[in-house]
Amino acid sequence: MEALKKIAGVTAAQYVTDGMTIGLGTGSTAYYFVEEIGRRVKQEGLQVVGVTTSSVTSKQAEGLGIPLKSIDDIDSIDLTVDGADEVDKDFNGIKGGGAALLMEKIVATPTKEYIWVVDASKMVEHLGAFKLPVEVVQYGADRLFRVFEKAGYKPSFRMKGDSRLVTDMQNYIIDLDLGCIKDPVAFGHLLDGTVGVVEHGLFNGMVDKVIVASKDGVTVLEAPKAG
């Protein structure tokens, strides 16, 4: 599995060229993309500027000598590469297994080309087998948990040891065990309108390419263009 993740990450790095501003994703597959960019910076003199999606990725990129800028200092990003926890046939996805969904979505929004790197196990018919992360403010989080519980969403707080995990943005994550999300777009809108929800892990209609690594090789899937 790790070998497939590395293949996907290294393949995505081939889309990066000199002068680009690139979004650096978070997670076990995006890790290999960042590593390959670091190698190219060091060995090939690749000239890029990175925008990171988590403190973990910032630390990795700094260690590799990749120049970084804050999202607040750029207007657009040429290319962002990130992982995904599930991708359906309509190119909707669940992200946030690494608890970085808010920053990942913020970086994805001004991106001209958005690529996900996954192994074949992440491609699914319907989203929802992977728990859907919902980032919530700490104030009122227990009340919101009960709302989700009453709705039948089977919520659980993301934990770190014996305490609730706190994201880079100082929020909590409530994971929803939905089993199957029949209409990701509608459910995303529902969560968007829920007071106390900062962001959710449904990335609907955002990705341009999905690089899928399997035992048979690498496949690049192109999402249909809007309109």
Curated annotation (Swiss-Prot):
InterPro entries: NagB/RpiA_transferase-like, Ribose-5P_isomerase, Ribose5P_isomerase_typA_subgr, Ribose5P_isomerase_type_A. It comes from Streptococcus pyogenes serotype M5 (strain Manfredo). This is Ribose-5-phosphate isomerase A. The active site is at E104 (proton acceptor). Its EC number is 5.3.1.6. Belongs to the ribose 5-phosphate isomerase family. Keywords: Isomerase. It comes from the Bacteria. One of its GO terms (molecular function) is ribose-5-phosphate isomerase activity. Pathway: Carbohydrate degradation; pentose phosphate pathway; D-ribose 5-phosphate from D-ribulose 5-phosphate (non-oxidative stage): step 1/1. CDD domains: RPI_A. The keyword Isomerase applies. Homodimer. GO terms for biological process: pentose-phosphate shunt, non-oxidative branch. SUPFAM superfamilies: D-ribose-5-phosphate isomerase (RpiA), lid domain, NagB/RpiA/CoA transferase-like. Substrate binds at T26, G27, S28, T29, D82, G83, A84, D85, K95, G96, G97, G98, K122. HAMAP family: Rib_5P_isom_A. Catalyzes the reversible conversion of ribose-5-phosphate to ribulose 5-phosphate. It catalyses: aldehydo-D-ribose 5-phosphate = D-ribulose 5-phosphate.
